[in-house]
A protein has these predicted regions:
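Core subunits and conserved enzymes of cellular information-processing
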Residues: 2-222
Length: 222
C-alpha cells in the first residue's frame, strides 16, 4: 500500500515538473518570437513604406508627445491590457506581458543596431529589400510567438472580445479594428504606406506557412 502511495506521489511530482518545464520552454519560445518580430519591425521601419497599423499609430503618437516608442507603446498596451483583463482574463498569459512590455523597446533597440550596420535605405531598391526582409522576419516571429500559445498581445485580444459581444465574425471585427487604427495612425502622422496594408490584410498565409512548416514542429518537441 505504501509503495502504491509513493509511486502515485512520484508520478504527480514528475508530472508537475514536466508541466513546469513545458511552460518554461513555451515562455522562451514566446520571448524569442517577440524578439524576432521586433527585429522584423525595425527593417520595415527602415524601409519607410509603412508599418503594421498598431505600431504605426504608436510611432505617430510617441512622436507627437516627444516620447520614446517603448514608453509610449507600453502605456497604450497597459490601457488595452486592463480592458482585456476585465473582459476575458483567460486570454492573458505570460506571453501577453512579454509582448506588451518588450516590443516597443526592442524595435527601438534593433532599429539603432540596423542603422549602425546598414545605414539609411536611401533608394527604392534598398527600401524594397528592407521591406521584404522585414516582412519575412516579422511573420516568422509572429508565428513563433502565437504558436507558443501562452497569451495574446493586448491589441490582438480586442477583436475576439468584441466579436463575442457583437456576434460578428472575428475576421470582420479584426478588419474593422485595423482600419480604425490605420486611420488613427494616419491622423497622428505615423509611418503609413503599402506595408501598412500588407501587414494588416495579407500576411496571414505567410504566418500560417511558418507555423505549419517550422514552428508547430518546434512546439511539438516541447
Amino acid at each position: 500500500m505504501n509503495n502504491e502511495k509513493e509511486s502515485a506521489l512520484t508520478a504527480m511530482n514528475t508530472n508537475g515538473r514536466s508541466k513546469l518545464t513545458a511552460l518554461l520552454y513555451k515562455t522562451l519560445m514566446s520571448f524569442v518570437g517577440v524578439l524576432v518580430l521586433s527585429m522584423g519591425e525595425s527593417f520595415m521601419l527602415a524601409a519607410n513604406m509603412g508599418m503594421d497599423p498598431f505600431t504605426s499609430a504608436n510611432l505617430g503618437g510617441s512622436s507627437l508627445l516627444h516620447m520614446g516608442l517603448g514608453n509610449f507603446q507600453l502605456m497604450v498596451n497597459f490601457v488595452i491590457f486592463i480592458f482585456v483583463l476585465f473582459s476575458d482574463r483567460h486570454m492573458i498569459g505570460i506571453g501577453t506581458v512579454i509582448n506588451m512590455v518588450l516590443v516597443g523597446y526592442e524595435i527601438q533597440w534593433f532599429s539603432a543596431i540596423r542603422q549602425s550596420l546598414f545605414g539609411t535605405a536611401n533608394s527604392l531598391t534598398l527600401q524594397i529589400i528592407n521591406a521584404v526582409i522585414g516582412l519575412i522576419i516579422f511573420t516568422y516571429g509572429a508565428s513563433m510567438y502565437m504558436t507558443a500559445n501562452v497569451g495574446v498581445a493586448p491589441y490582438d485580444g480586442v477583436a475576439p472580445i468584441i466579436s463575442r459581444w457583437t456576434h460578428l465574425r472575428y475576421r470582420v471585427v479584426r478588419v474593422i479594428q485595423d482600419i480604425i487604427v490605420m486611420g488613427l495612425a494616419y491622423l497622428v502622422g505615423g509611418p503609413f504606406g503599402i506595408l501598412t496594408f500588407i501587414v494588416a490584410f495579407c500576411t496571414g498565409p505567410l504566418i500560417e506557412f511558418w507555423t505549419d512548416k517550422v514552428n508547430q514542429k518546434i512546439y511539438n518537441l516541447i
